[in-house]
Regions:
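PAPS-dependent sulfotransferase catalytic core
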Residues: 1-61
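Generic hydrophobic secondary-structure signal
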Residues: 5-7, 17, 21, 85-87, ...
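A structural signal for well-ordered alpha-helical scaffolds and beta->alpha junctions
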Residues: 14, 18, 88-91, 118, ...
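General helical structural elements
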Residues: 14-15, 42, 93, 151, ...
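Enrichment for repetitive, rod-forming helical segments
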Residues: 17-18, 96, 223
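A general structural signal for well-ordered secondary-structure junctions
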Residues: 27, 131-132, 226
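PAPS-dependent sulfotransferase catalytic domain
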Residues: 61, 66-164, 171-191
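PAPS-dependent sulfotransferases, especially Golgi type II membrane carbohydrate sulfotransferases
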Residues: 156-232
Length: 232
């Protein structure tokens, strides 16, 4: 029996990875991608399904925040053989998804927080904490061998059973909704930043912060040997 805590940034592929991981967890999961702190920090658990294992997904939460508030937020839940996972996505694709989301919902205002969170997650990656298992979403999406490595590292029996699923949580993809449910690999998720051509996205790309994010991502691509996923 193993329990999982997964950290990710909203629109960062967290639900896709959850749908892929959960079928590989022998004995099923107790919470799925179901624990959320919607700004109120009310410690509310929303259970989806039953099982021997616990899978808790945190979105838009810094790892340092969790470390400081762990006992309060977990609210007495006991975790065994804990696997901590952090999901990191190409920042330009991530921002493009948020910009696209804002086009559909003009009152949406989370872009600046997303940028700050990405830098924090990247710093955790650079620190190479052995207790954190990183999943690079873009590499995960395209590379079956990488997915097999992740499963092996987490002690799971590899399966791509959930790979093609697009769930209607967060209304699916910012671009495609749930249109590709059953064929998720057909979505063009690796080139989202090329698909948004408006003032907000173009200004971001040329900004100092945008260029800094690009440089850090490209450095990560060198380390992960995924040069084909560099931002050019």
């Amino acid at each position: 029996m193993s329990d999982f805590i997964v950290f990710g940034i909203r629109r960062g592929g967290n639900h896709a990875i959850a749908q892929w991981l959960i079928p590989q967890i022998v004995g099923g999961v107790k919470y799925g991608h179901a624990f959320t702190l919607r700004g109120t920090r009310d410690n509310e658990f929303i259970a989806y399904g039953e099982g021997e294992n616990t899978y808790i997904g945190f979105e838009d939460i810094r790892f340092s925040e969790f470390s400081e508030n762990k006992e309060n937020w977990l609210n007495g839940i006991e975790l065994n053989d804990l696997k901590t996972i952090m999901v990191l996505r190409n920042p330009w694709n991530l921002i493009a998804s948020h910009v696209q989301w804002k086009i559909k919902r003009p009152l949406y205002t989370r872009k600046n927080k997303v940028i700050s969170l990405w830098f924090d997650y990247y710093n955790e990656y650079e620190a190479a904490d052995k207790d954190i298992n990183f999943i690079i979403y873009d590499k995960w999406f395209k590379d079956i061998n990488y997915r097999k490595q992740i499963s092996e590292k987490l002690g799971l029996e590899f399966s791509d059973e959930g790979l093609q699923t697009v769930v209607n949580i967060g209304r699916g993809s910012s671009f495609d909704g749930i249109e590709y449910d059953g064929n998720a690999q057909d979505m063009d998720v690796l080139s989202r930043y090329k698909q948004v051509d408006n003032y907000s996205m173009n200004t971001f790309k040329e900004s100092e912060i945008g260029q800094d994010l690009k440089n850090k991502w490209n450095h990560l691509c060198d380390l992960e040997e995924i040069k084909e996923l560099k931002i050019i």
